[in-house]
């Protein structure tokens, strides 16, 4: 059930979640996200049904965080998700996700609850540029080999499924600065689409401090990748990771534990960057998540039955 209510003269969309218990149905209102990127999305923040509590935005690029009993089994589209000792789990939607997702939670005594999630589709900024020389668009053979090696390292780091649950505690911006690039935008050169931009770009000056948006473990630090220059990946748990690109320096190393708000690196313009800035990316394994939507996540309270 969906309803509208007014707060401070602004209409908010409220999802009424059904709770099934002993043959009756109750409803619990939710608070919609305030970020302009999710105004039209179905937003779940502390939506509770029996054994279901979720926070996030059901939207392409959205990350969902759930909480249940640690003994419960959680499946998304038939695939079992990790559940932490505190009952936290997570999953996300890709940039172009158009499918219906089935979330199933089964308790230790066999009780089962299902929810269908369909991410809202988004429109992205597409820029078309003609007349670019082919020599500019294609890297030299040696550079291409190096770029593939870099990509292999990054993909390996993002496959790690640790038992950490820092993703469930919320995220903060890694830097205070003007946003100059957004998730999902794409350029088409001479009629050929290039890879979309999957990060959130912040303007900055070389040397500006970069903070950990959430606690975690440093999975990767390489100072000189071909495209992304100084590249750092921090594991926040269960496949959720932050990636920082174009860094000028790192104050931590692979394997270090970091806490939310800790200064871990410095802004730069390394790699193929036209000026100093921070490119912050979020992944759920190989699923590219919109960092702007992640900033809206709210921690969930312990589930009790």
Label every model-predicted segment.
Residues 2, 7-8, 29-122:
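Cationic-aromatic interfacial patches
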Residues 116-228:
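Surface-exposed, glycine-biased beta-strand/turn segments
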Residues 203, 209-213, 244-245, 255-258, ...:
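Small beta-strand-rich domains/subdomains or short beta-sheet motifs embedded
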Residues 256-276, 280-305:
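Extended, charge-rich intrinsically disordered regulatory tails
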């Amino acid at each position: 059930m969906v309803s509208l209510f007014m707060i401070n003269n602004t209409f908010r969309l409220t999802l009424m979640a059904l709770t099934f218990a002993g043959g009756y149905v109750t409803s619990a209102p939710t608070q919609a996200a305030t970020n302009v990127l999710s105004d039209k999305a179905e937003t779940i923040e502390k939506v509770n049904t029996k054994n279901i509590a979720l926070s996030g935005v059901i939207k392409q690029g959205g990350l969902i965080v759930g909480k249940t009993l640690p003994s419960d089994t959680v499946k998304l589209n038939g695939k079992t998700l990790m559940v932490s000792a505190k009952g936290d789990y997570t999953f996300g939607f890709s940039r172009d996700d158009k499918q219906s997702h089935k979330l199933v939670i089964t308790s230790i005594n066999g009780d089962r609850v299902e929810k269908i999630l369909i991410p809202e589709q988004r429109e992205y900024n597409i820029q078309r540029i003609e007349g670019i020389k082919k020599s500019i668009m294609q890297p030299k053979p040696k550079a291409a080999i190096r770029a593939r090696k870099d990509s292999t390292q990054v993909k390996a780091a993002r496959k790690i499924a640790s038992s950490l649950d820092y993703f469930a505690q919320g995220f903060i911006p890694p830097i205070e600065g003007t946003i100059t690039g957004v998730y999902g935008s794409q350029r088409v050169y001479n009629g050929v689409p290039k890879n979309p931009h999957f990060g959130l770009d912040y303007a900055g000056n070389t040397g500006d401090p970069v903070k950990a948006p959430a606690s975690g473990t440093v999975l990767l630090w390489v100072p000189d990748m071909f495209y992304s220059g100084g590249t750092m990946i921090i594991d926040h748990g269960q496949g959720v990771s932050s990636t920082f690109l174009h860094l000028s320096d790192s104050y931590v190393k692979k394997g270090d534990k970091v806490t939310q708000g800790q200064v871990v690196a410095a802004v730069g313009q390394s790699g193929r960057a036209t000026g100093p800035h921070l490119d912050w990316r979020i992944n759920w394994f190989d699923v590219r998540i919109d960092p702007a939507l992640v900033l809206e996540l709210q921690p969930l309270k312990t589930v009790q039955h």
